C-alpha cells in the first residue's frame, strides 16, 4: 500500500468519527480537494507531489477532530507530527516539511518555504473554486489572482464581482 493511501485510510477513520453527516462530508470534500490541488501544484512547480498530498490530508484534521479552528494550524502541525510518527510513513526531513506546511498554512499573506506555499495555494484553490456563489475572502484574493495567472484561468473571480 502506498504511503498516501495508508495515510488516507487513517484520516478517513478519524473523519468517520464525526457524528454530524454534513460536517463529515464537508471535511472529506475539503481534505481530498486540497490534496488533489496540492498534487497538481507540486507537480507543476517541481516539488514532491506525494509529500504535498500528505500535508494536505492532514492540514485541517485537528480542527475537524476538535471542532475548533482556534490556532488550528499550529495545533494541527503537532497532531500531524504525532500521526506521522505513529504510522512511520515519513523520514525526519519529510515529517518536518509536512509539519511546516501545516503550521504555516493559515497565514496566506506571508510567503514561506516552497512546500508551505504549495499547501497554502491548494487550500486557497479549494476555498475559491468549490462554491462559485461565494465571494473570495479578502485575505485570499491576491493569492487566488496569482494562481489564476499561473494556471491560465482567464475568468478570475474577485471579491467585488460576487
Which residues does each predicted region cover?
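Divalent metal-dependent phosphate-bond-processing catalytic cores, especially two-metal-ion Mg2+/Mn2+ enzymes
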Residues: 1-6, 19-47, 58, 86-89, ...
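An amphipathic alpha-helix signature
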Residues: 4-12, 35, 74-81, 99
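Hydrophobic aliphatic residue packing
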Residues: 11, 34, 52, 98-102, ...
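Short linear motifs at secondary-structure transitions and domain/linker junctions
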Residues: 28-32, 76-78, 92-95, 101-102
Amino acid at each position: 500500500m502506498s504511503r498516501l493511501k495508508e495515510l488516507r485510510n487513517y484520516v478517513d477513520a478519524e473523519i468517520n468519527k464525526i457524528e454530524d453527516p454534513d460536517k463529515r462530508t464537508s471535511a472529506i470534500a475539503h481534505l481530498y480537494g486540497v490534496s488533489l490541488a496540492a498534487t497538481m501544484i507540486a507537480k507543476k512547480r517541481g516539488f514532491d507531489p506525494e509529500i504535498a498530498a500528505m500535508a494536505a490530508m492532514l492540514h485541517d484534521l485537528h480542527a475537524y477532530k476538535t471542532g475548533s479552528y482556534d490556532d488550528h494550524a499550529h495545533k494541527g502541525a503537532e497532531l500531524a507530527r504525532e500521526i506521522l510518527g505513529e504510522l512511520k510513513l515519513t523520514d525526519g526531513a519529510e515529517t518536518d516539511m509536512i509539519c511546516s506546511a501545516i503550521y504555516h498554512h493559515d497565514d496566506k499573506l506571508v510567503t514561506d518555504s516552497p512546500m508551505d506555499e504549495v499547501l497554502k495555494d491548494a487550500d486557497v484553490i479549494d476555498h475559491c473554486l468549490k462554491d462559485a456563489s461565494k465571494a473570495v475572502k479578502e485575505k485570499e484574493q491576491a493569492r487566488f489572482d496569482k494562481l489564476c495567472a499561473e494556471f491560465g484561468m482567464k475568468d478570475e473571480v474577485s471579491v467585488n464581482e460576487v
